[in-house]
């Protein structure tokens, strides 16, 4: 089975997910030549990302790393939005999430937003332009952000799902912060990884997320790239 999405930029295929007997041969983060052939065994599932979107390959069989099938061009604009700008300037994933910033499914609407309810590695490109997000904005709350140089607070009004990360809590690569607020079951821990993608295309972004260990962000990027998939 192969799934392909259309985009506008050409990029070499990148393995972004891998499971099964051949996972060591084709690990996540492995870049492939356009003319590469993948020989998969029964139980193998490989997800490839390139400038056209994602392809899912399921073994057994031999597959080309590239494909000629082209799907809806609307996906290309979604992918372009993901790689342009940072923080609040990044467009939301319109094809995947609600444009309001409040998603009824409780999932973060943009991979570059810090979900205050989840402990994770958080890859960012611009430490001075970071956005925090909460899935439940029904009540006003005060977010306490504790880090290596003390604590600061961030007030969120009722109905406010997003806010800029406070300048008082300076971010550098490797810095860790504990987030807490009234009603939280437990504090969450966020470790920031400053990434400088070698390229600004989707594969460059995905490679940076893989190297930074930012799995949840990678999952959202893959989901955005797979949102309008066609089968072929």
Predicted regions and their residues:
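Flexible, surface-exposed loop/linker segments and immediately adjacent secondary-structure boundaries
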Residues: 12-31, 37, 51-129
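Low-complexity, Pro/Ser/Thr- and charge-rich linker/hinge segments at domain boundaries
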Residues: 67-68, 103, 113, 194-220
């Amino acid at each position: 089975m192969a799934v392909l999405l259309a985009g506008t930029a050409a990029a070499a295929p990148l393995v972004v997910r891998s499971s099964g007997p051949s996972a060591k041969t084709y690990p996540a983060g492995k870049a492939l030549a356009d003319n590469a052939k993948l020989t998969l065994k029964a139980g193998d599932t490989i997800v490839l990302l390139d400038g056209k979107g994602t392809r899912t390959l399921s073994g057994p069989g031999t597959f080309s790393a590239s494909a000629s099938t082209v799907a809806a061009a609307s996906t290309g604009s979604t992918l372009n939005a993901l790689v342009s700008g940072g923080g609040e300037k990044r467009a939301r994933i319109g094809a995947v999430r609600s444009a309001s910033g409040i998603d009824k499914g409780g999932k973060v609407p943009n991979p570059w937003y810090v979900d205050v309810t989840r402990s994770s590695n958080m890859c960012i490109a611009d430490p001075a332009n970071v956005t925090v997000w909460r899935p439940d904005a029904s009540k006003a709350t005060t977010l306490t952000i504790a880090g290596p140089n003390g604590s600061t607070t961030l007030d969120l009004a009722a109905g406010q799902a997003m806010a800029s990360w406070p300048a008082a809590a300076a971010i550098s690569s490797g810095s860790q912060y504990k987030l807490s607020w009234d009603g939280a079951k437990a504090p969450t821990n966020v470790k920031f990884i400053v990434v400088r993608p070698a390229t600004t295309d989707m594969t460059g972004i995905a490679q940076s997320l893989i190297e930074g260990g930012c799995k949840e962000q990678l999952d959202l990027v893959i989901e955005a790239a797979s949102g309008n998939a066609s089968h072929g």
